[in-house]
Amino acid sequence: MKFGVIVFPGSNCDHDAYHVISKHVGQPVDFIWHRETDLSTYDAVILPGGFAYGDYLRAGALARFSPVMNSVKKFADSGRFVLGICNGFQILCEAGLLPGALIRNRDLHFICEHIHVRVETSDSPYTNELQKGMVLRIPIAHAEGNYICDDSTLAELQREDRIVFRYCESDGSITAAANPNGSRDNIAGICSRERNVLGLMPHPERACEDLLGSSDGRDIFRSLAATVAAAV
């Protein structure tokens, strides 16, 4: 089993993701520069948070054209696992690997705080060790985290059980007040139709040690590792 963390110019959460896979998941992991095109030795890749290409034009819009992204698409099409965190989620949407888009936060300013998300499904490689309805405390840090999609896309996501995380209160209730950025239907994370691609705006890699305020994100990575182990 081997993980890769893709590094774009402007990525700043790549070392956090590397640390989690190495220390808390206990698996080999490499940094993958955005100009690389060979992902054949990896079982799962992570597109980390940050500001790829300075978020010029809009978040993820330039990164989608990096040489590595054609390989990421083929990687996902082959059934292997792709996790996009924050800026990584934005890039996955821009690249067409996930539906919808991430736009400016409702209040038009950068948000950096701990929030709560509810696990909406345990039927995914990233949540199969979590229980549906479980509440996780995970930080967010973004200016463009407002998830939008049209009515048909939302209906499809709901029908196919592809909404993986939703913003919630600490007791798990879904409210407008718990929605930090205006995301439609309080959506915090979604997966692809094949369920092997996940994008989420919260930062689980920053919630893997109690010293940092929460270890709730650790089981997301451990779920993925268990799924990869069963697949290889």
Predicted regions and their residues:
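N-terminal beta1-alpha1 cap of cysteine-dependent amidohydrolase-like domains
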Residues: 1-85, 93-99, 105-111, 118, ...
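Short, flexible active-site-adjacent loop segments at beta-strand->alpha-helix junctions, enriched
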Residues: 88-89, 123
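Active-site metal-binding loops of divalent metal-dependent hydrolases
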Residues: 50-51, 88, 143, 204
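Amide-donor transfer/coupling interface in amidating biosynthetic enzymes
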Residues: 73-77, 102-232
